[in-house]
């Protein structure tokens, strides 16, 4: 089962639309120069709108600590100034402590041809809860 199928199976829905290279307007804090960055594979929101998962794929030789910190900064801006699609700022209150960075790593390339980051030497970021929780998942060519 791919990670995408897993999220959809449990009622999470995507906030990205790759066909139109579009993102929900309220999620603009995760864009770079108005575009979806290569490292952002997907954003999933739970059906109860109380959990947000950012599926991220760092570049092959990227420093994991700096990568996570950069995304924590984006998440903090979203928490302070953003809102969920079709909702107001109140929705952020229950979401604030339930934002997770899912960091993909592995050997080879993802289904879009982007090379995976090698297995990190240090998984200490997984214990960090400074702004968001982090989960490292090994993936493969089929995004499984």
List PLM regions with ranges.
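Short acidic, S/G/P-rich loop/turn micro-motifs used as interaction or catalytic elements
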Residues: 58-66, 106-115, 141-143
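Generic structural hydrophobic/aromatic packing signal, biased to beta-strands
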Residues: 55, 99-103, 136
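A broadly used, surface-exposed interaction patch
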Residues: 47-97
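Elongated alpha-helical scaffolds
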Residues: 94-112
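"Short basic amphipathic alpha-helical interaction patches in structured regions
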Residues: 67-73, 113-127
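Charged, structured surface patches that assemble and position nucleic-acid processing machinery
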Residues: 37-39, 121-144
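Extended, compositionally biased accessory segments flanking or bridging domains
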Residues: 1-64
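Catalytic micro-motifs at enzyme active sites that drive phosphoryl/nucleotidyl and oxygen chemistry
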Residues: 41-43, 86-92, 118-125
């Amino acid at each position: 089962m791919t990670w995408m199928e897993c999220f959809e199976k449990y009622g999470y829905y995507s906030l990205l639309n790759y066909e139109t290279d579009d993102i929900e307007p309220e999620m603009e804090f995760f864009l770079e120069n108005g575009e979806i960055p290569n490292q952002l594979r997907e954003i999933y929101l739970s059906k109860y709108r109380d959990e947000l998962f950012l599926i991220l794929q760092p570049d092959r030789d990227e420093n994991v600590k700096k990568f996570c910190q950069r995304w924590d900064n984006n998440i903090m801006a979203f928490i302070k100034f953003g809102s969920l699609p079709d909702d107001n700022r109140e929705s952020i209150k229950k979401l604030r402590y339930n934002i997770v960075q899912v960091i993909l790593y592995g050997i080879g390339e993802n289904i879009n041809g982007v090379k995976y980051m090698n297995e990190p030497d240090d998984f200490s970021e997984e214990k960090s809860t400074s702004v968001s929780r982090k989960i490292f998942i090994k993936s493969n060519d089929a995004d499984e």
